Amino acid sequence: LFRNSVEPEVLIFFRQTMAQNLTIRLARSTDYDQILKLSEGIYDGHDYLPPRYHTWMAMENLHVMLAFSGNKLASLVACSIIDEGKTVVTRAGRTSPEFCGQGIFKLLQQAIVDFSLKRYPIIQQWRLVTVFSPEMLDNSYENVDEQDSLTCMVLSSTKRPPSFSFNLDSLEIQPCTKEYVCDVIFQKEEEKLFPGKVIQADRFPIEPSLSNINYLMQENDSLHFAVEKCVHDGCRPRSFSLGVRSQYVKFVNWCVTIYSDDPQLYQAHLVHQFKRSCEEIESEFSFVCCHDKKFTKNGIEVLQEFLSLKSDEDIKLRKAYVYEQ
């Protein structure tokens, strides 16, 4: 079991690790300037940690841990306690280039997991998102979800194409409430839409539940839920999308995750979420679409059309794997 995989000798919270002259402790609000310096240049401005840091400091069930070498900040990792306290998710990990390759991040990650197990004794599993495919990890990690993501920049409202050419009137997508999502989508359609029982919200892996949606609302600007319009009583939704709007270092970011097995419904959700993001955000922004890999080619074609791109080189493809231990 995950609990039994924790080695007692790695419990180093709040004490020096003499072998590497490290000090590991929880972050404070006053560490912000050092964290900004550690985060300089990460993800080319697509980094969410600095804008969220003070919000995170005020949130329950969220902790940031730091590793110092002397008085230099060497590494950082955060964790969220979600799924009604059953899961710890590690996030926002980073290490200074000066200290890369020394095993510091692995030590820090183990420290924050150990801290979480002691503080939240009902934790049953550790979950993380990474770009590493299953063959790159050992057998102790269970691959529970994987998605492709497409990222592109959208110009400010005054420079955008005047209209959209896709005609998908027969597949109308409509917004829905948090209550509908939690009472209908999560309760009645979970097995069909989320076979791994995990959804990725801006690449943050959570179980589909009301408590986790409320958690998301604490740290993001807004959430936009959408389903296809039902045409008769008793109609059951075959698709769902979640758009997350948040502030990154250089840009506002809109990340949509689409769940459906139908290519037309996938495209309809992408159109709907893209239009909604353009309505809400007037400045230049980053648009990210996450989905099953079978829809990647279709997604690239749609975004090329929207943004009048002559090449798909301006659309960045990335894979994300969710593991549990």
Predicted regions and their residues:
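Conserved catalytic-core motifs of GNAT/GCN5-like acyltransferases
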Residues: 81, 129, 143-166, 305-325
